[in-house]
Amino acid sequence: MAKEKFERTKPHVNVGTIGHVDHGKTTLTAAIATVLAAKFGGAAKKYDEIDAAPEEKARGITINTAHVEYETANRHYAHVDCPGHADYVKNMITGAAQMDGAILVCSAADGPMPQTREHILLARQVGVPYIIVFLNKCDMVDDAELLELVEMEVRELLSKYEFPGDDTPIIKGSAKLALEGDKGELGEVAIMNLADALDTYIPTPERAVDGTFLMPVEDVFSISGRGTVVTGRIERGVIKVGEEIEIVGIRPTVKTTCTGVEMFRKLLDQGQAGDNVGLLLRGTKREDVERGQVLCKPGSIKPHTHFTGEVYILSKDEGGRHTPFFNNYRPQFYFRTTDVTGSIELPQDKEMVMPGDNVSITVKLIAPIAMEEGLRFAIREGGRTVGAGVVAKILD
């Protein structure tokens, strides 16, 4: 059968389930897909199909992730669910599955548990902008006061990690009842309430093409009689012929003008997010630009050397290091298109980092990189990946 054409009539939003092991993330994922498929069309998913998440690779790291799609009246959602805690850590840090918002699943019977806290912290560190809470297994709790207590605990935990705990939507329900076809308040009604919260609480994300222009430099050529051409894939925004741009990172920032946009050897008036292009730069010498820099809208992004990051260090089985590393470890940090050496400062209570750990670190690079919070990077030793990370906070 021919693949059906993807009709994009509704805005698209990426979400995912997070929370403690056995609190019902996968059951809820199945329940959402099943209830919404019956209401708005789409494919219902069984628990087993989601639980048997296929392996995929992101930045050389193997992650098990299940991808489920569903629709509401207003939107199309792509939803990720991971079977194991380690998969969540890797997924969130590598940005393999970018989330515009997360559904935190918390069992009403147990309340917040260690991974509940850890996933909220991770969401904060990697820049997941919105969290909605699904208080699951409410059918197992008869005491209304107990429910209220759990809700309060969850709100406090969210506030502790700088999410708006008091204003976060909390939906009470039972994913199991909903999946079994229960039409009551805790069943189907709760899922519809959750869908409504997704639609109203998570804003429609900005499309890449609407962002400010940014293109990582992949290659630089000099074409006699025309000048210097820089090639790369436009990450976001639009570049028009005649616009002023900046070259940022590694060396002092310089301004130049884009005098031509080429794609597949054709001249264009403009290039936009997703295009692989060559940009002709006025008065720029070939030796003035190098891989690892970015071209961007003037003033939109600054070069930095000092930042905190959340990192996952590959285990030995994943092809990572066989031994721990200590304070002042100096690997290469691969940002976008190039490696820059940097030194790692560990948190005070952490003497060493073992392969397979995730940890918050402070990094000082030997050369500045065009950087924003949320930027992903790989940690490498002699060209092989030993870790993955995300910029949590820029220090200077």
Swiss-Prot record:
CDD domains named among the record's database cross-references: EF_Tu (cd01884), EFTU_II (cd03697), EFTU_III (cd03707)
Binding site for GTP: 19-26, 81-85, 136-139
Span list, region G1: 19-26
Residues the record lists as binding Mg(2+): T26
Recorded GO CC terms: cytoplasm
Highest taxon of the lineage: Bacteria
Renumbered residue ranges of the record's region G4: 136-139
Keyword line: Cytoplasm, Elongation factor, GTP-binding, Hydrolase, Magnesium, Metal-binding, Nucleotide-binding, Protein biosynthesis
Region of interest: G5: 174-176
SUPFAM superfamilies per UniProt: EF-Tu/eEF-1alpha/eIF2-gamma C-terminal domain (SSF50465), P-loop containing nucleoside triphosphate hydrolases (SSF52540), Translation proteins (SSF50447)
UniProt xrefs under Gene3D superfamilies: P-loop containing nucleotide triphosphate hydrolases (3.40.50.300), Translation factors (2.40.30.10)
Chain positions covered by the region annotation G3: 81-84
EC number: 3.6.5.3
Catalysed transformations (reactions): GTP + H2O = GDP + phosphate + H(+)
Molecular function (Gene Ontology), one example: GTP binding
One Pfam family in the UniProt entry: GTP_EFTU_D2
Stretches the record annotates as G2: 60-64
Transmembrane region(s): none
tr-type G domain segment(s): 10-206
Subcellular location: Cytoplasm
Quaternary organization: Monomer.
Role, per record: GTP hydrolase that promotes the GTP-dependent binding of aminoacyl-tRNA to the A-site of ribosomes during protein biosynthesis.
UniProt similarity note: Belongs to the TRAFAC class translation factor GTPase superfamily. Classic translation factor GTPase family. EF-Tu/EF-1A subfamily.
Name the record gives this protein: Elongation factor Tu
Organism from which the protein derives: Cupriavidus metallidurans (strain ATCC 43123 / DSM 2839 / NBRC 102507 / CH34)
